[in-house]
Amino acid sequence: MARRPSKEWRERFNALSLKCKQLIHSSITNDFTTTDKAQQSTFYSSSGLMDVRKRLSISESLEVFGSLIDNWDLVQLVGTRAEPFVLNNPASYLLVNQLLALAGQAHSAASMVFLNSLMYDDALDHVNLWPYEVERPIPQITREVLSPPPFSVNSYYLQRDIDVIKAKTKAAVYIENYRAGDVFAKKRSISKGATFEERVYHGAVTMLQRMVKLRGSTIQECFVIAISSYRCSDCVRRMMASESGTGAIHEMDHICIMRSNALRWLQAAFSDFPEFPFLMTRDGVKFASNCGAVSTQVPLLFFQTLEMMVLTMDGTLSSTWEGWVCCEWYDRARVGLFSEMFDRRGVVAHLREAILRQSRLLRYQSRGLHLASVSNFPKRSVSADGLDDRIIEGLQKFNSKVCSFIQSWIFQIDLVDEPARWLAVMIKTFASALLYVMGATSLSLEQSAQGTLGIGDPISFPRQEILLEGEWIAVDWYYPDPDLADMREMGMALVDNASPEYTDWEYGFFNVQTTNSAGNVKEVIEERRKQLVAEFGDQGKLLAKVENTRILDAVQKITSTFQNPQDFCDSADNVRKAGERHQVGRRPRVIQMVGTEGQLSAFVLHNVLRPAYKATRFTTSGKNSGDIRDMNIVLEISGELGYKSSLDVKGMDSSTKPFQTNLSLSCVFHRLRGEVLGYPAFFLGSTSSSKDNYVVTRTRYRDEHGGILVEEEYKLTYPQYVLLLGAIHWTSPTRFTDGYFQEFVMTSRTVFRSGLLNTADQHTFLGVIMYALLEKRLRQRWYGKHGKEMREKIGQRREALEEYEEHVKLLGSVLGDDQVAGAFCQGIVDEEVILRITRDLCDETKFLMERLGYECEPEISEYSAEFLKQKGVLGAPELFPERLLLFSSERGDMAGSLPLDRVKIMLSMTDEKIGRARCPLPYASLMLFTSWVSGTASFSIGEEGRLLYRTGRNWKKVFASKRAASVAWKDQFTSDGVFDVRWNGFGMFYKEWASANTKTILLGCGLLWACSDALGVPFPPLVQKDEILCPGTSVYTIPSNAMTHYLLWATRRDRADAERMWRAVRDDLLRGDNDPLESYIEYVDKMFAEVGVIDIPFSALHIYGVGMGFVAGVMPVPMEVWYDFGLFGKVGGFGTWIAELVFKDIRIDREKYDLPRLSMWKNAANHSLPSEVRRASLYARDTLHEKYGMVVPSAVLVAERPGCKIDQALFEVRRVGMEDVRELEKVLDELTRLNHLERKFTKRLAMGLFIVEKLTERRTGYGPAIASNGWGHIAAPYSFQARLLECLAFPMYNGFNYEAVRERVFVDGKLPGDPKLYLKIGRQALSYSEEAYNLVSASMGLSSRQAADMRDMILEGINGLEEARFALNPRKTFLFDVSRRKGAGFFQTPHRRKTNQAYCEMMGMALLLMEPWKFSSGDWRMSFSHRLRAILGRR
């Protein structure tokens, strides 16, 4: 039992609460009259504290936090999974649930009192556990953060020739440290005529408003989730050492948050604030006016602290190391977190290298995820290549205390494998802020959207030219550089050996269109919006958003500018907009969008290059599984001896110029000549019925000195024609909509467009050419035969390769600007030789990329290989836990959504973090607490019970709904909780209060509502009548029907209850004399007489499934005879299913809108498909209906696909007008309809009606024996992950890859809509016959490869089965084989049908992940009820 929270803590809190209450003012509401009506305005004081709308009053908030302190031992017991959930009376869970949910709605003044009441516990400061625990620094907040300097407009200047404001210093590019209130108080504008100062103030305010965007929880909710879930590093170590897979800790003698150094630093920084000094409004971050001078860095430091606490909880950091990380970050905040981060972080890579070199590491060799050997790796010197000098120099930029501290141990490391790998990951928290890097992207355009030189363009001379629009355009070149000439030959060979992805070019172009933005500029969209609103009213706003999607823009262009070349060229030169990307720890980037005309030319390159590079072994495109299989290449490379090169091309988009694009263009142009391709139609006046689709022009060929060899007539195929027109017009202007210091900024016209359809293809193709050439040269012994004489002159000889190249097997991969290279040296054991060979190879990849004109920054290491943000270190994985943020996001468009969506987005990120965590066990309680804190929705109620909502530009106007909100729903909330909370019988609660003259209703889902088949939050320990039903399920629990099975099993009735219920329903079943049900009823009576006292439903199942299924076709006994659905509902069993009904996205209702204009667009889109494609699809659909009675929905027909993409765009664009308030009204209306849920959800309940029985005992696993050594940072020795990996093994590298196949079929195939619908129809057809399946795939327009892939997906899983749930997130179960094949290794069923077998194996896998300690210990039989078999057997 945890000790009761100390009396001193509560007393300290009480004393601080009194001070807080003395600061409370009431808000002043004045009436003022405008010309038309009287209005009220509320004025807030600039000192003291006030109640605010939609937050609990300050007094009640303090009571909630006081109660939370009184019950903190319970919070910790629930958090460490030591407190059982007693099904009949879950009082402790009920209390913690309510307190956390209310704390999430509390006024932040109470959070400040709570924070200031914490007393630091220094128990971990003095334990001898280097490197995990260290002596921490005492928090000293710098003067510049506590009393920030004033804002200065002199940080910026106006570049008058282009009228753009730029930063004078590096710090001003991002968010500088200054007094935030200074800029909010000034007049600001970027409209025409605004002064320089007004523009600067506008830019500064906008930077601050957008500095943090929330993922799915409010600021207060984030704080509550972080403090309640926090586990100190001592508890984390105990969890990791625990024999229990749940990580339960029963004996706790401390309060974890009092050991957090991150909270201690935050306490010191916030000590003078009466409430959180910033808040989140619809406009973004706003600073409180009653907190004095607040630094702009405060919100950043706040979220950095919360994220740091989560990293300590999962074992990435430790409670004492938090102090040193804070010491450095608070020092950086003196100037600006982000600018200092970029300036100081270079040394961290050297620190990592020093840690690895001085440690006794293990090297894991693997092939295709089969661990072949484990060996010791020798230590290396840190002074041999000057690494020590680089470290000392780099550390000078750090805070002086941190610098001295790191220097005191960095050169005396002598660690074994596990702590060394931990330290190497932990040290990275000094490199990257745990935040999305925000700021005005227009100030950092130089890094992302203006041209960079690379290392200059190589020389080339025209080889072939085409006459177009009166000018000769080169389409092929001579390269005097022999390396480049060889690369051109290699590129030509690659495209010649591959067929274009789409042979019908027009259909192919149409098929790759998405629902993303079309790239039109603001005034074009605004003009269309005005026209459509004038014509259609409120729905015009919706149509304007839909019209600006790529798919609809393409429909309109096909009937307009694509009709003739002149219109096409004119439109291609129109200005387009640019978007932006923000990432963790990286500079903001501009994404330059391209018009649909530009995308047409880009599609030509995409259609030819993509199949060419995918045919090589050097790309991973289309092979992504989301799990450890994606890391195979870096694990293989890093596990080999020698150097590895992780090559990052510096600014690949911005340094890609015509030279680089010409290389790929010449290969594609050559492949598209008429004698090879034929003459297909491709817009611009060509017709699909004609065989003569070509443009007659002239071509001439030159020799290497420029002399013309021959000039002749040339027939340009239409793909070639479109390609060349695009090449002429590819530098159309792009406008970056800034909105900070000016309306927009023009970006460079010389930069390669990052928004082009073929951006990734262009970069990947060049990388693949280079690797393919390198492999070919090694195979042909080129370095020994030609390298010496050719490279001698330029000092680039590869002497080791000249001698040993026949022994070298190149290992490498390319995707976009990311490359990795290494080698396997066959038959060579001398380490010095291997180091020389691999060094040559790393230098050669850099040299060849530089020949292409790119500047490269390779990270060459003996230890690490990195690719696509995944790193292998000596053959074991090192993931990037610090790059995943739980509380903030790039866009922030989910915060403020309804509970189900908010919780889903938070849990989705938690799943990702679980897959990268060193100790994932604490995430089980974090998920439960998140479901309680964020599973809420609050509504403001105005006069006459009308819902209040904000609308208008910048959300400035508050409106009331037209009708009073429903109150009938309140009648069902009859059970009392704490603080006037009321509960209904379905695990939902509500609370009503008035604050700041506004009434608020809080609705929440509680208890086990998220432990469901849709959300998959792990069960806590379940206890029923002193029987432990389950010790809690593992953190790897996935959303599946097995969760319904668990809850049904937990709420089953005992014999006496079941018999009583049976007596109540049996008389209703009889319908007069000679009723066939008589014998059935006799049978049930007999069963009650014979069967034992317990496990009624499961015994019933054995006796031919009477209780839960059919007997000779008669109706089954209602399930409520066997299960207590009152209890099932009370503990939240229906919670998620209710949330899906009640909190439904209003955008789904758009399908009911009558929009003739949209129908016209859809019709035009559908008819732009090739007529033979439409005819084949509709013929297959009709044949299926006639022959098999199957109805194929229009949503999956290829004949209707373009229209379906427009429908998809309709559902995806943001809410408009009244949709927000209608969504809220609908919630309250739906609540009134909650009754007889067990009947409403009969099928979904029936999916859990199965039993499992142990057949035999065994203790053998399928995986490698890694528990004793561990495997990299992610699976420490004897950890839960290591044991689970021994049990389940890695996924089969060459086995069925569900995610990769899904990506091929649905993502690459550009199939719109829900994949489940396609699988459901496919499964239905397969159950009839092979012919039916072929007809379905024809109606869907699937290629033979896609049809085969979809068949594999159907046979592999249960997708497409009605009500079946098995939502696997491969990033959560990153290491493990969780395929149905593995389920078959432990589970079998007597039911022989294929769907039954599949369901058994999938549920078996789900059970294995829920309780691996139980289900991996033997072989099991799974039996289904008749009711379940009936559902599985339906077509």
Swiss-Prot record:
Reactions this protein catalyses: RNA(n) + a ribonucleoside 5'-triphosphate = RNA(n+1) + diphosphate
Keyword Hydrolase tagged: yes
Domain (RdRp catalytic): residue spans on this chain: 604-880
Sorted UniProt keywords: Hydrolase, Nucleotide-binding, Nucleotidyltransferase, RNA-directed RNA polymerase, Transferase, Viral RNA replication
The keyword Transmembrane appears for this protein: no
Function: RNA-directed RNA polymerase involved in transcription and genome replication. Following infection, catalyzes the synthesis of fully conservative plus strands. After core assembly, which consists in recruitment of one capped plus-strand for each genomic segments and polymerase complexes, the polymerase switches mode and catalyzes the synthesis of complementary minus-strands.
Family as reported in the entry's similarity comment: Belongs to the reoviridae RNA-directed RNA polymerase family.
Descriptive protein name: RNA-directed RNA polymerase VP1
Species per Swiss-Prot/TrEMBL record: Colorado tick fever virus (strain USA/Florio N-7180) (CTFV)
Highest classification ranks of the organism: Viruses, Riboviria, Orthornavirae, Duplornaviricota, Resentoviricetes
